[in-house]
Curated annotation (Swiss-Prot):
Residues 84-140 form the AWS domain. The gene is SET2. Histone methyltransferase that trimethylates histone H3 'Lys-36' forming H3K36me3. Involved in transcription elongation as well as in transcription repression. Its EC number is 2.1.1.359. Signal peptide: none annotated. Its main location: nucleus. Residues 142-259 form the SET domain. The lineage of its organism: Eukaryota, Fungi, Dikarya, Ascomycota, Saccharomycotina. This is Histone-lysine N-methyltransferase, H3 lysine-36 specific. One of its GO terms (cellular component) is nucleus. Pfam families: AWS, SET, SRI, WW.
C-alpha cells in the first residue's frame, strides 16, 4: 500500500474506453484478523481537542519570521463561529409497522439533508427518530474483508455486491491539527514507517489512521477507482465516508483516488495497473492529474474534467509559471471558467453541496458568483433557501469576517478558511460580501425561523460594525441596514424548542465523538422523546411554585382527547400540547378537547409571561392553521386504516367459510380489486428451498401441527415475536435492493409493497421450518448477515416472485374494461382453491 497522505478524493471519472475489466479476488485468503494486529481498532474518531473536526470553528494561521535563522513559524488561532442549530430536513416520519422501522429520508426520498451530505440527528428533525439517513451514526458498513495484494500490501475487497453510491466505510482515526500533522509526518519518516494514513478533513484538521483507525485504512489508491471519499456533517462534527462510485462486484478490490497532497511525502510508484495510471504519487512535483478538480466541485462550477484536461494541455506553460506551489487545484483554470446561471434544482443541490464542503477561497468565490448570477429567478431562490442556504451563507460570512480581522492583526495570513493565499485583499473581500448581501436581499423570507436558526441577524450586525470601524464601505452599510430592517418585521412561526447539542469535552472526545456517533444508541420511546425536550414545570425549584404549576397543568390536561398531555414552556410562558402516540405537538388545545373553565386571576408574577405570550400571538395563529391541517390528515389516515382492517377481517372470514385458503395473506391490492383476473397457482410461497406439495393445506393442518408438535421448547410467545421481528429486519436489509431494478416497470409504490410482502413471506417460511437465526460471536448471539448460499436462494425466489407479479401486473392493464366482473371471478377461484398466492401488488 502506498503512502496514504491524501485529502478528499477527487471522484474524477475516467473515460469509459479506458476502464478495464475489474479483477476479482474470490479465492483470496482472508487476512482481516492478521491485519487487525497491525493497528488499534477504533469504532469512532478521537479528537485532539474540541476545535479540530468541528463544523463550528474556523482556524486562522499567521506567519512570523525569526530574524536569527530566517525561518518562519506558524501560530494558529481557533475562533468559534456562532452556534447554529442542527441542519434539519423537511421529511415526515414514515413508520412501517411490519418492518418496525422508520423509512423516512431513504435514498429515493429527495431528503434535503441526504442530498447536501448532512446526516439527520434524532430529536432534531421532523422526520422522526432512527430515519434512513443515519449511516455514519449507525455504522452501516458494507461487508468487506482484508487480503494480501502482490505489490500494494494489504487491500480491501467486497464480500458482497455493493451498489452505486452505497456507503462502504467511514475513514476513522485520530483527528489532529496541522501542527501535530506536520510533526507526525517527520516522526513517522524517522521511524522509517513505509505507510502513512493521513486524510485532510479541513484546512486545519487531519485524520491520522496510522496507528489507530478502522478497516477503511486498508483501501488502496487507483487512478481509475471504483469508490470515492465524501465529507459529511454529522451533528457538530465533520466526518469522512467512503462510497461506491459505481457498482462493485463481490471479490473486487475497493479503491479510491488519494489525490495526494505535498507535505514532504516521498514520491512513490503507483501499482494500480490502470491504463490511465499516472505512474507516481506524491513527491515535490505534483502531476496535472492530481490537481484536477473533484467531480463534485467541477459539476457545481458547471465544467467537466475533460474541459479541464483540454485547458491544461493548451496552457501548461502558463500553469507552471503562475500556479501556487501550495495549492491543490489548477487555480488558473478555475479563474478562466466563465460562470453561468443555475437553471434547475439539480444545479442548486450541486452548488449548495459543494459550498458546504469546500474551504478553498477561490472555489467559494466562484460558487457565490454563480448564485449571484441566478438571483433574478424566484424559483431558484426558493430552492437555495430550502437547501440550507441561510446557514451556509452565515458560515461563509463569518469566515470572511474572521479573515478580515486576522489580516489587521498581522501583516500576513496563511491557510485560513477564507484567506489571502490567492492574493485577495480587503477590497476583494468587500466585493464578495456585497455579492452575498445582495443574494440575501433577493431570497424570499416569509418567516424569521430559518434566518434566526442561522444567526444571520447577528452576523450581518457584526459585518456592519466591522465595516464602520474600518473602511466604511457605503454599499455594505446600506445593504446591512436594508436587510436588518426587513428581517425585523418578520414573525417567528413558532416551533417547540429543539434539544440543544451537548458540547463534546476533551475527555469524551478522546474516546468517541458523541453518544450518537458511536452508533450504539437505541431509539427512545415516545415517553422518552417527550421528556427529553419538555421544559421543567415552572421557572423555579421551590415546592410552592412547582405545586402551583402542577395544579395548572392538571387542570389543562382535564378534557384532552386520549393520549394528549400538556406541558409548560418556560421560554415563552405558555403551555403546549403533545400526543404520546403520534408525537404531534401544538400550541393550541387539540381538536376534540373540552373547553377550559374560567382562567384564574393573574398575579404580578405572570405579567411578563403574558406579555411575552402576546408578542408571538400572530405567529401562533399561523402555527395553529398548520397543526389543524396535520390533525385532519392524521384523522383521515386513521379512518382509512380502520376501514382497511375491517375489509381484511371480512375477507378472512369469507375465506374460512369457503374453506379454500391457499395459505397466503390477503393483500390490500386484493381487497381493492386492482389485480388481474387470470393466473395459475404457480406462485407457492411456503418456502424458498423447493416446492411444498402440501402448500394448499397449510392452514388446514396448522392447528394440528401446533397441538402435536414438540413441546420441549422453552421459547415463549414474546420471544417468538422477537425472532419474527429479527427475521423481518434481516430480510428487509436485502429484499429492497434485490427487487429495486423492477421500479422502472411497476413504480416505486408497487416495488415497496412487493418488498414488504416478500419480507413477510420469507419470515413466515423461516419460522414455519424452525430455522435458527444466523449465528454470530456478538453479544446478541445472532448476525444480520446471511450466508452466500442462502442469499442466492432468496434472490432466485424473489426474482421468480417478481416475474409472476410482472405478468399479472401487465395483464391487469389489458383487462381494465373487465374489472367489474372481478368479484365473481375471484369468488370462483377461491371456491376452487386456485389462488394467486399473494403475488398481486398494486398501489392502494
Amino acid at each position: 500500500m502506498s503512502n496514504n497522505n491524501f485529502q478528499e478524493s477527487s471522484n474524477n471519472t475516467s473515460s469509459p474506453s479506458k476502464r478495464s475489466t475489474p479483477m476479482l479476488f474470490l479465492d483470496a485468503e482472508n487476512k482481516t484478523q492478521e491485519a487487525l494486529t497491525t493497528f488499534e481498532l477504533l469504532n469512532a474518531c478521537t479528537y485532539q481537542n474540541k476545535y479540530v473536526g468541528s463544523a463550528n470553528v474556523t482556524t486562522t494561521a499567521t506567519t512570523s519570521t525569526k530574524t536569527s535563522n530566517s525561518t518562519s513559524t506558524k501560530s494558529h488561532q481557533q475562533q468559534h463561529r456562532r452556534k447554529l442549530e442542527y441542519m434539519t430536513c423537511d421529511c415526515e416520519e414514515e413508520w412501517d409497522s411490519e418492518l418496525q422501522m422508520n423509512l423516512a429520508c431513504g435514498p429515493d426520498s429527495n431528503c434535503i439533508n441526504r442530498i447536501t451530505c448532512v446526516e439527520c440527528v434524532n430529536r432534531n428533525c421532523l422526520c422522526g427518530d432512527d430515519c434512513q439517513n443515519q449511516r455514519f451514526q449507525n455504522r452501516q458498513y458494507s461487508k468487506v474483508k482484508v487480503i494480501q495484494t502482490e505489490l500494494k500490501g494489504y487491500g480491501l475487497i467486497a464480500e458482497q455486491d455493493i451498489e452505486e453510491n452505497q456507503f462502504i466505510y467511514e475513514y476513522i482515526g485520530e483527528v489532529i491539527d496541522e501542527i501535530s500533522f506536520r510533526q507526525r509526518m517527520i516522526e513517522y519518516d524517522l521511524r522509517h514507517l513505509k505507510h502513512f494514513y493521513f486524510m485532510m478533513l479541513s484546512n486545519d484538521s487531519f485524520i491520522d489512521a496510522t496507528e489507530k483507525g478502522s478497516l477503511g485504512r486498508f483501501i488502496n489508491h487507483s487512478c481509475n477507482p471504483n469508490a470515492f471519499v465524501d465529507k459529511w456533517h454529522v451533528g457538530d462534527r465533520l466526518r469522512m465516508g467512503i462510497f461506491a462510485k459505481r457498482k462493485i462486484s463481490r471479490g473486487e478490490e475497493i479503491t479510491f483516488d488519494y489525490n495526494v497532497d505535498r507535505y514532504g511525502a516521498q514520491s512513490q510508484p503507483c501499482y494500480c495497473g490502470e491504463p490511465n495510471c499516472i505512474k507516481f504519487m506524491g513527491g515535490k512535483t505534483q502531476t496535472d492529474a492530481a490537481l484536477l478538480l473533484p467531480q463534485m466541485i467541477a459539476e457545481a462550477l458547471g465544467v467537466t474534467p475533460r474541459q479541464e484536461k483540454a485547458w491544461l494541455k493548451e496552457n501548461k506553460s502558463i500553469r507552471n509559471q503562475q500556479q501556487n506551489d501550495e495549492s491543490n487545484i489548477n487555480e488558473e483554470f478555475v479563474n478562466s471558467i466563465e460562470i453561468e446561471p443555475i437553471e434547475n434544482q439539480d444545479g442548486v443541490t450541486k452548488v449548495m453541496s459543494a459550498l458546504m464542503k469546500t474551504q478553498h477561497p477561490l472555489i467559494i468565490k466562484k460558487l457565490i458568483e454563480r448564485i449571484f448570477l441566478s438571483n433574478d429567478q424566484d424559483d431558484i431562490n426558493v430552492m437555495f433557501v430550502r437547501f440550507h442556504g441561510y446557514k451556509t451563507i452565515s458560515t461563509i460570512l463569518q469566515d470572511l469576517l474572521v479573515a478580515k480581522n486576522s489580516g489587521k492583526e498581522s501583516e500576513t495570513t496563511d491557510n485560513n478558511d477564507i484567506d489571502n493565499s490567492t492574493g485577495d485583499d480587503d477590497q476583494d473581500k468587500d466585493e464578495l460580501i456585497i455579492k452575498i448581501l445582495k443574494i440575501l436581499v433577493s431570497w424570499p423570507a416569509v418567516t424569521k425561523n430559518k434566518i434566526a436558526s442561522a444567526n444571520l441577524e447577528e452576523v450581518v450586525k457584526d459585518i456592519q460594525t466591522n465595516n464602520e470601524n474600518s473602511n466604511n464601505n457605503d454599499e455594505i452599510n446600506q445593504l446591512c441596514t436594508s436587510l436588518l430592517d426587513r428581517w425585523s418585521k418578520l414573525e417567528m412561526a413558532y416551533r417547540i424548542p429543539k434539544q440543544e447539542s451537548v458540547p463534546t469535552n476533551n475527555a469524551a472526545a478522546a474516546a468517541t465523538t458523541t453518544a450518537t456517533a458511536t452508533g450504539t444508541t437505541t431509539s427512545a420511546s415516545p415517553f422518552e422523546r417527550i421528556s427529553s425536550h419538555t421544559p421543567e414545570v415552572g421557572g423555579t425549584n421551590t415546592p410552592s411554585s412547582t405545586s402551583q404549576q402542577q395544579q395548572q397543568q392538571n387542570s389543562r390536561d382535564a378534557g384532552l382527547p386520549e393520549n394528549w398531555r400538556s406541558a409548560f414552556d418556560k421560554n415563552t410562558g405558555g403551555y403546549y400540547y403533545y400526543n404520546l402516540v403520534t408525537k404531534e405537538t401544538t400550541w393550541e388545545r387539540p381538536l376534540g378537547s373540552l373547553p377550559l373553565g374560567p382562567k384564574p386571576p393573574s398575579g404580578p408574577g405572570l405579567k411578563g409571561r403574558i406579555n411575552k405570550y402576546n408578542e408571538i400571538d400572530l405567529a401562533k395563529r399561523e402555527e395553529l392553521r398548520i397543526q389543524k391541517e396535520k390533525e385532519m390528515k392524521f384523522i383521515e389516515m386513521q379512518n382509512r386504516d380502520r376501514k382497511l382492517k375491517e375489509l381484511i377481517e371480512m375477507s378472512k372470514k369469507s375465506m374460512n367459510n369457503i374453506g379454500g385458503s391457499s395459505g397466503t395473506t390477503i393483500t390490500a391490492a386484493t381487497i381493492n380489486g386492482l389485480s388481474d383476473n387470470g393466473g395459475n397457482n404457480n406462485g407457492n410461497i411456503t418456502g424458498i428451498y423447493g416446492d411444498d406439495k402440501h402448500s394448499k393445506h397449510h392452514h388446514h393442518h396448522h392447528d394440528k401441527h401446533l397441538k402435536n408438535g414438540p413441546r420441549n421448547t422453552s421459547t415463549s410467545s414474546s420471544s417468538g415475536n422477537n425472532v419474527e421481528k429479527i427475521w423481518k429486519r434481516i430480510f428487509a436489509k436485502y429484499i429492497p435492493n434485490i427487487i429495486k431494478k423492477y421500479e422502472s416497470e411497476i413504480g416505486r409504490d408497487n416495488v415497496k409493497g412487493c418488498a414488504k410482502e416478500l419480507v413477510n413471506i420469507l419470515t413466515q417460511s423461516e419460522i414455519k421450518h424452525g430455522n435458527s437465526l444466523p449465528s454470530s460471536s456478538s453479544s446478541n448471539g445472532y448476525s444480520m448477515e446471511l450466508s452466500d448460499k442462502k442469499l442466492k436462494k432468496i434472490k432466485e425466489y424473489s426474482h421468480g416472485y417478481m416475474d409472476k407479479f410482472l405478468i399479472k401486473f401487465n395483464n391487469s392493464k389489458k383487462h381494465k374494461s373487465t374489472m367489474g366482473s372481478k368479484g365473481s371471478d375471484n369468488h370462483k377461484r377461491k371456491h376452487n382453491g386456485d389462488g394467486d398466492n399473494g403475488v398481486k401488488r398494486s398501489k392502494v
